[in-house]
Amino acid sequence: MRPTLRCASVCLAAILGCALLAPAATEPSIASGNIDDIIRTLSGRTDAGSLNLLSRAYYAIEQFDNAITAGEKAVNLQPNNSLYHLWLGRAYGEKAAIANPFSAASLARKTKNEFEQAVKLDPAFVQARADLSEYFVEAPSIMGGGLDKARDQAVQVAKYDEATSHWILALIASKDKNLAETESQLQQAIKVAKDPSQYWMNLASFYSHHARPDDMQKAISQALAQPNKSAETYYNAAGVLFQSGKNFPAAIEYLKKYLNSGAMVEDAPAFRAHYLLGQIYEKMGNKPDASAEYKASLALASGFAPASKALGRAQ
């Protein structure tokens, strides 16, 4: 996931695990990465659940206009569904990040409204509160942002998930350029997390961002050593190594483990894993393998423009 209004200033948001509702077993899975199949299957449907999943499929391939269209329809059909408001808010937020300033202001307000509605409908929905907190941290006050508002969310989230509360406080500290407090809050999140692996990866991302490669590698090793880690940890580890420019062979190994795990998740669908693998090969100067991975990504998600552009570059 790219840094956007929804992403933390210390590049942590891309790694925070999303405790979202999974699609029903009879529905196609975004995690499998076959976005083309999902879009073909769902495009003719008019029920709210299908429209929400369709919106998320478009969101995954960064077609945010289509994601907004489907997401708005889902919300209109089921206005009391917190999850649908969350995903519509995300689509608005990503669109705002690439829009012209006039449009971005309107979209940002819509983002905030959807996140707030998601929280209002389900006060215990930790991920909605986390996304709203990110908005408050990143948005200017004229658009409803504010660190005090984010701090209030951290207090509210602590009732349900202490680790996420510390993560929000880390975002705030980072925005204040208080690196020691950022690191401390991330370390506290690790201590109280049910799944410490994702928070070790947050810490690894922080170390990478601040040119502490040895600490980064130690944090990655700790994440991968957790007995209850999700397979996504391998994907995230590869992403941090790629961004740091370090240990590409290990990053390749981690991505292959993830792709072979049979436990992929929506935040890291297969087509994105192939795309990241292609990026790593390209950085290594291995254009044949890079091209093969970009083609594998496009075979699952033909509308994913970054892979198309990368393939043209690698061939």
What are these regions (language model features)?
Residues 20-65, 69, 83-86, 315:
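N-terminal leader/linker segments that initiate helical-solenoid repeat arrays
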Residues 32, 61, 95, 139, ...:
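Structural motif corresponding to the intra-repeat A-B loop/turn of tetratricopeptide repeats
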Residues 41, 45, 74, 117-118, ...:
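Canonical positions in the second alpha-helix
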Residues 50, 84, 128, 165-167, ...:
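TPR alpha-solenoid repeat register
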